[in-house]
Design a protein with these regions (language model features):
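FIC/Doc superfamily catalytic core
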Residues: 1-127
């Protein structure tokens, strides 16, 4: 079973990633980003594996600009947290993570399967 973030989780992640004075521009966009990994089509998960769900969350947060400032930081930290609460950890250098999030945010990398493949490549489980 997959565990998901909720709005309170996301706001706390934003405060940690961006700073205590997070300014939300559009709560609806935050809610939409949170709902996307849970989406289903005709009773089937739209994003059938954990890394596709994480990719959908990252993509929505990075592209939709729900915050006044800090959308990319929120997107990455929320994605990493989502994977962590589902017992998957990320191992990638700061430069790799930066380039990856910039590529997603600018649309240079927009295919969810490609985003998920990168996350999967960096992902590991302990034990």
């Amino acid at each position: 079973m997959t565990d998901y973030l909720d709005l309170e989780d996301l706001l706390e992640i934003a405060r940690e990633a961006v700073g205590r004075d997070v300014m939300v521009r559009d709560y609806g966009l935050l809610e939409s980003a949170l709902a996307r990994p849970r989406a289903s089509v005709f009773g089937q998960d739209a994003y059938p594996d954990l890394h596709l769900k994480a990719a959908a969350l990252l993509h929505s947060l990075a592209r939709n600009h729900a915050l006044v400032d800090g959308n990319k930081r929120l997107a990455w930290t929320a994605c990493r947290t989502f994977l962590a609460i589902n017992a998957h950890w990320i191992s990638a250098s700061e430069d790799e993570r930066f380039d990856f999030v910039i590529a997603v945010a600018t649309g240079a990398m927009s295919d969810l399967h490609e985003i998920a493949a990168q996350l999967r490549g960096w992902s590991y489980q302990e034990g």
